[in-house]
Design a protein with these regions (language model features):
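N-terminal membrane topogenesis motif
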Residues: 1-30, 193-195, 201-217, 393-403
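Signature of the first transmembrane helix
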Residues: 3, 10-66, 215-242, 252-253, ...
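Membrane-water interface segments that mark the loop-to-transmembrane alpha-helix transition
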Residues: 15-28, 53-108, 112, 277-303, ...
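Residue-level recognition of transmembrane alpha-helices
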Residues: 20, 24, 51-54, 91-92, ...
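Interfacial segments at transmembrane-helix termini and the short loops linking adjacent helices
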Residues: 44-45, 106-124, 241, 305-335, ...
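Helix-loop junctions and terminal segments of transmembrane helices
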Residues: 58, 62-80, 250, 254-279, ...
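Hydrophobic alpha-helical transmembrane segments
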Residues: 118-127, 148-199, 322, 358-362, ...
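Membrane-interface junctions at transmembrane-helix termini in multi-pass inner-membrane proteins
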Residues: 127-149, 329-355
């Protein structure tokens, strides 16, 4: 049966989506609030140890969750795809299962040392990645409540951790250990809910394409994290704490939009995958082209206008806010188009990966000049330029394919 994407969403889908956003929103709010409170409780020195360990390990979250989750959401809903569920569970659990013993060994040797702290942060990132995939697989089985439960549990863990720090004076290593322990139990519970149902026996020949899909689909998230890391490195080179702090605030605001759109697309992705299976890949590519056709020229115009503003010496809050709005609008347009192409075949996924790599190259190159020149405004302008190139490469290729 062909699934139409133009139908009005059923009330149950709207209610489930609202509940899922509430769970994720509670976790994000708890995480950001906890960091602010921890800074006050610990002071800058101890908090820097905690924040740096988490920051360095952030790429592991993207590596262990995004590609695997997106591949599962693209392949499992299709005919015969349920047999791939154990493979995606294994791909999600393996990094966490490796990271935890390494952390335990280092913690046993030196509980308060830097190696144990970084290993705990790495295990925490892998655990969060595993949780995201397990929650997605539960959603695919119609168990959306498991996703909500998981992220509400993580929100409670953040609040409880802050409470323990206030009551006991526990330090960064101990708090990271607490979060790793919570994730170990939570992931086991999520996995148990998946193991109870029979997935059937998969054709081993389908494993390699599934792993390849997961690898290709991880590129966009990993390059996005890398672009953010490189941009912050440019700010570190400026050695201006105020400018770095201002950019951090703007980047948090942007991340709210990006994560919100990304998560909404993850919720809708199984329906998109089934729709593409029913209507054909050509229809998905045509729809992606129709989305990008106005978005890319509008984005290019925005970059030119913002460049003129920069050349005129304007780089204050109004200019930075305009750049933020332009980047948010571009992202909101480009992500759905890429979702359509990524859910077609390996050729589409390779194209999306190449476009993401080019986006990273543009952000890194433009940021090298723009961050010293205009700080937060320059960084957001570099982001806009990267988004235009990413969408432009995709649009140019789709025009060749669909003309």
């Amino acid at each position: 049966m062909t699934v139409s994407l133009r139908r009005r969403p059923p009330p149950r889908l709207v209610a489930v989506t609202a509940a899922l956003f509430a769970g994720r929103g509670a976790f994000r709010a708890a995480l950001w609030t906890a960091n602010l409170v921890l800074l006050g409780l610990w002071g800058a020195e101890e908090f820097a140890l905690y924040a740096t360990a988490n920051g360095v390990s952030g790429w592991l979250l993207a590596l262990t969750s995004s590609g695997i989750e997106k591949a599962a959401l693209a392949l499992v809903p299709r005919r015969g795809g349920q047999t791939l569920r154990p493979l995606f569970m294994l791909l999600a659990a393996t990094p966490f299962a490796v990271a935890v013993p390494v952390w335990l060994a280092l913690a046993a040797a030196d509980p308060g040392g830097a190696p144990a702290r970084y290993a705990a942060a790495a295990a925490y990132a892998c655990g969060l990645g595993c949780c995201a995939v397990m929650a997605a697989l539960n959603r695919l089985r119609g168990r959306a409540r498991a996703d909500v439960f998981a992220y509400l549990t993580l929100a409670v863990a953040q609040a409880s951790g802050v409470g323990l720090v206030a009551l006991t004076g526990m330090r960064a290593n101990a708090l990271l250990a607490l979060h790793v322990g919570v994730l170990a139990v939570l992931n086991a519970v999520l996995a148990a809910g998946l193991i109870r149902g029979r997935a059937g026996r998969a054709d081993k020949g389908s494993y390699r394409p599934a792993v390849r899909a997961a690898a290709l689909l991880s590129v966009g998230e990993v390059t996005a994290v890398a672009a953010t890391s490189v941009t912050f490195a440019y700010f570190a080179h400026l050695d201006d704490a105020q400018q770095t702090s201002v950019f951090y605030v703007w980047s948090v605001a942007l991340s709210v939009v990006v994560m919100g759109v990304s998560y909404l697309l993850r919720i809708l992705q199984p329906r998109v995958a089934v729709w593409i299976e029913g209507t054909g890949e050509a229809g998905a590519r045509r729809m992606a082209r129709r989305i990008l056709a106005p978005a890319v020229p509008a984005g290019a115009l925005a970059v030119v206008v913002l460049g003129v503003v920069l050349a005129g010496g304007q780089r204050g809050m109004a200019a930075t806010g305009a750049a933020l709005l332009a980047e948010a609008a571009l992202t909101a347009a480009v992500l759905p188009a890429f979702l359509l192409v990524e859910n077609t075949d390996d050729r589409g996924r390779r194209l999306a990966a190449v476009a993401a790599c080019l986006q990273f190259a543009v952000v890194a190159a433009a940021g090298w000049f723009l961050v010293p020149a205009a700080a937060a405004f320059g960084a957001l302008l570099a982001y806009c330029a990267g988004e235009v190139v990413k969408g432009g490469v995709m649009l140019a290729t789709l025009k060749k394919e669909t003309s």
